[in-house]
């Protein structure tokens, strides 16, 4: 399942119970807005609460029992994987078991049996081994909401010394674009409108605003490619796998014919999560 990461807490019942988590006496409306950037996800309970929502949504989707045991398969950036792995596992695998909460007025009783952690980006390649076949080196560029994570794989193995995290995520592009549209046209376009125009999808909008958004999108992609090069990677020398929410934007502006890089695109925003699930299934099959 995929949903916006916004989370707003209330002491009193909101006007609707749609997308509402009830946990330890408080109400949390999920999916409105987005999380602020935090260096450490364990610094507050937001990601734990979002995990409970994700579990409930997955159970609804699968029509499974609301009283059940689960194993969580989650990811961390490879650049901080070793440093944060144990703390994040303990953050999700709490002593309070089973966890009881209400989601959309339905009671859930969940026992989190284990937490499996995997490196983001690399796990998605478990779904696409063909991108690594016969390639001694491949660069992975994961364009997320807040950061762009870089990693080179040599002989299909992540090279930890090459990991970089750049604060150039799509959210920065969207915020800067919204401000520029407002200054130049007086229009307060929404984040959703900007995303649709950046992906070249249909959206009714004044042509001047559309032009500004598309121009900012082009400049944003140029900044990413420049930052990757400045980080010591030669985009023309090795194939580059672009993934994450921003890869759909980049694909509209960069092709192999441009001779800027040798791009391959994974546009599925669920690729990391599906990769984690695939790896856990392989572990069980042994």
Give names to the regions the model predicted.
Residues 1-138, 157-172, 192-286:
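Nucleotide/phosphate-binding catalytic cleft detector across ATP-hydrolyzing
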Residues 175, 179-182:
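Long, charge-rich alpha-helical interaction segments
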